[in-house]
Amino acid sequence: MAGNLRAYSFQTADGTTRTGAQIDYNGQPAGYADSPEEVITYVDAHDNQTLFDSLTLKLPTATSMSDRVRMNTLSLATTALAQTPSFWHAGADLLRSKSLDKNSFNSGDWFNSLDFTKQDNGFGRGLPPSADNQAMWVYDQPALANPALKPAAADIRAASAAADDLLRLRFSTDLFRLGSANLIEQKVSFPDGGPTATPGVIVMRVDDTVGRDIDRGLDGVLVVLNASDEATTQTVPALAGRTLMLSPVQAKGSDPVVKATTWVKASGTVTVPARTVAVLVEKQSEAHHHAADTSWWQSTSGQSAPWQAASWQSAATVCTPAGSLV
């Protein structure tokens, strides 16, 4: 999410600070880029299983379909909100399935279909061809025969709407597309990193109060990806006393669950529901104000920026839904 940069440094699980180039990935540096545009970030492509099929095999069988949809959204969010160019495999937003086929180049339309009407995702059409899949048939067969693992049209529509919101988030602010290694190294951090990091949770901050002013409407964004099956509470001491609120994209968006996200101003504490990605924004303060452009808010919410109204000055400072003023 920080551009896969070789020189980007962060605190690792053992408490040491390392650069991307110092992280080993199967004998190769995990961070290898000098600039974010050198990397294309994705979670599925034409090779191997689709995202939906991969989650089918990896999530516990008893995982509800609604949670599977949320995990699909979380997976796509790791690329949509990354500093690199983002790539989505065709149909990833529609829960597309190839019935667990890991190499479908010669499997025909039966396994490669893509239904843009959002009625059927293609799961359960039969065992995938043996050439590249037979070793997995022992796992594939019971999964493909399980009706609970096939999404209904309503699930596909929900996944599509959530994916649309991710695209709106990405283009709601240039802070998700800084475009240079220097800006990423200046502005992007992961406050929950290190040995005390919460399993299944990523917290990313993009601080627009340092370096060049990129978004004249914001002082920064805080992204929380909570892949766990419980709500997570994260405190960012550097944001204590600061006013953050849920992005207008999500406040007006398709997902009712994310709207339960809360922010406690006094301590800089955010609580995000289970299996949810939340993006909180901080409006630009007078200290960093340079003829702030509020068009980003209007284009994403359809309303005038709320800090232009008197209600902003009289807003409460207690724990409230993060979609409200705090």
Protein language model regions, located:
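Extended, Lys/Arg-enriched charged tracts that mediate electrostatic binding to polyanionic substrates
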Residues: 1-26
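Loop/helix patches that line or flank the sugar-binding groove of alpha-linked glycan CAZymes
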Residues: 19-222, 227-233, 238-242
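Solvent-exposed beta-hairpin/edge-strand motifs
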Residues: 239-253
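C-terminal beta-strand-rich structural cap/linker in extracellular carbohydrate-active enzymes
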Residues: 261-293
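Tryptophan (W) side chains
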Residues: 296-297, 307, 312
